[in-house]
């Protein structure tokens, strides 16, 4: 098996694992530990395979999931912060506002949603 195929298989596995663990704190250290590669090597490999930085991909996926929950449910923002592994509601609010240019509570009540900022899951060659 070529190095390229091995890297692709590793990244596919990591993408699946990230999707299964979005509702927990996902640090680069935790993901690299899971992969068995150094943080530096995994980030390089991830960028090469997907065209996205690993940290930004994780943040984008979490923000997308939270945005969808805000549209689809009445779950409190504090609950979403805890559910998706943020240290506090304030941390989630700051991160969300930086990503969507509007705080979560305003995102929920307006009809203007940031679907163009959504990061859908990358899976098996759909990069």
From Swiss-Prot:
Source organism (scientific name): Salmonella typhimurium (strain LT2 / SGSC1412 / ATCC 700720)
Purpose: Transcriptional regulator. Represses transcription of genes belonging to the flagellar regulon, including flhD, flhB and fliC; probably thereby leading to repression of motility. Binds to regulatory regions of target genes, including the promoter of the flhDC operon. Represses expression of the flhDC operon in a post-transcriptional manner. May activate genes involved in the multiple antibiotic resistance (Mar) phenotype.
GO molecular function: bacterial-type RNA polymerase holo enzyme binding; DNA-binding transcription factor activity; sequence-specific DNA binding
Name assigned to this protein: Multiple antibiotic resistance protein MarA
Domain called HTH araC/xylS-type: residue spans: 12-110
UniProt keyword Translocase, yes or no: no
Keyword presence, Cytoplasm: no
GO cellular component, one term: cytosol
Residue ranges for the DNA-binding region feature of this UniProt entry: 29-50, 77-100
SUPFAM superfamilies, per database record: Homeodomain-like (SSF46689)
UniProt subunit comment: Monomer.
Induction: Induced by salicylic acid, which leads to significant reduction in the expression of flagellar genes, including fliC.
Pfam annotation, one family: HTH_18
Spans through the membrane: none
Keywords: Activator, Antibiotic resistance, DNA-binding, Repeat, Repressor, Transcription, Transcription regulation
Domain of life: Bacteria
PANTHER family named in the record: MULTIPLE ANTIBIOTIC RESISTANCE PROTEIN MARA, RIGHT ORIGIN-BINDING PROTEIN
GO BP: any one term: response to antibiotic
């Amino acid at each position: 098996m070529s190095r390229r195929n091995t890297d692709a298989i590793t990244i596919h596995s990591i993408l699946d694992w990230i999707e299964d663990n979005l509702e927990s704190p996902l640090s680069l250290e935790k993901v690299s530990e899971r992969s068995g590669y150094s943080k530096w090597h995994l980030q390089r490999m991830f960028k090469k395979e997907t065209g996205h930085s690993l940290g930004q991909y994780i943040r984008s996926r979490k923000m997308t999931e939270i945005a969808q929950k805000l549209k689809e449910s009445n779950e409190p923002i504090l609950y979403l912060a805890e559910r998706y592994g943020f240290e506090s509601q304030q941390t989630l609010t700051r991160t969300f506002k930086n990503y969507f240019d509007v705080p979560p509570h305003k995102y929920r009540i307006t009809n203007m949603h940031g679907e163009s900022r959504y990061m859908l899951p990358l899976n098996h060659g759909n990069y």
